[in-house]
């Protein structure tokens, strides 16, 4: 008589086992993610308060952030007025040189264009100067230039606080911000009263 060996059972995943696996994986991933509180309270000295916010719509980020800074200095101007003068339809945007030239039209202000780093950014913010920066939001070789207004930074959450497009007080992690800013050439613009 020949004995036939029963085939071994292949392990099956029980519903409870799959559920437990998913819980462990998801819990592990959420522990690695940085969470930012829904409402941030900026009580540190590195947030420039009361800077007007103009949402940048349809490639109008340059005129929007420029209007924010100029209004913060007491000039009554809206992004549409700036856009009529410096927005270039062919490039769907505004050039850095035109941003600088427009700001220099105003009396009793100093316009400083520079190539910065995180230290210079922090120094300017701690002196109360919001900074216009040019970043590249594109991926790989696809370029997508964008102006942001940096209004603060917070080391406790590890990021800068910006006005970007339609978002006010958007927090961007240092690593991501520096990557975008590097692709934009680390260009920054400070506009201040003399």
Where do the model's predicted regions map?
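An acidic helix/loop motif centered on a single conserved Asp/Glu
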Residues: 65
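N-terminal compositionally biased, intrinsically disordered segments and leader/signal-like regions
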Residues: 11, 28-31, 35
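Active-site-proximal loop/helix segment associated with metal-binding centers of metalloenzymes
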Residues: 61
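Positively charged N-terminal leader segments that act as targeting/secretion signals
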Residues: 6-20
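Beta-rich catalytic cores
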Residues: 57
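Conserved active-site-adjacent core of cysteine acyl-enzyme catalytic domains
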Residues: 32-52, 70-72, 76-194
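Short, low-complexity, intrinsically disordered N-terminal modules
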Residues: 1-4
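Bacterial N-terminal signal peptides
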Residues: 19-30
């Amino acid at each position: 008589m020949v004995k036939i060996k029963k085939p071994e059972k292949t392990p099956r995943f029980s519903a409870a086992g799959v559920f437990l696996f998913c819980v462990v994986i998801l819990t592990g991933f959420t522990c690695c993610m940085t969470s930012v509180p829904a409402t941030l309270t900026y009580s540190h000295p590195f947030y420039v308060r009361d800077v007007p916010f103009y949402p940048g719509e349809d490639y109008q980020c340059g005129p929007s952030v420029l209007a924010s800074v100029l209004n913060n200095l007491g000039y009554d101007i809206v992004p549409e007025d700036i856009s009529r003068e410096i927005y270039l339809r062919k490039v769907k945007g505004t050039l850095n040189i035109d941003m600088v030239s427009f700001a220099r039209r105003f009396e009793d202000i100093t316009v400083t264009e520079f190539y910065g780093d995180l230290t210079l950014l922090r120094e300017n913010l701690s002196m109360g100067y919001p900074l216009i920066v040019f970043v590249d939001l594109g991926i790989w070789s696809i370029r997508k230039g964008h102006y942001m207004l940096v209004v603060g930074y917070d080391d406790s959450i590890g990021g800068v606080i910006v006005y970007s497009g339609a978002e006010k007080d958007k927090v961007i992690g240092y690593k991501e911000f520096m990557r975008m800013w590097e692709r934009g050439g680390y260009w920054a613009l400070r506009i201040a009263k003399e």
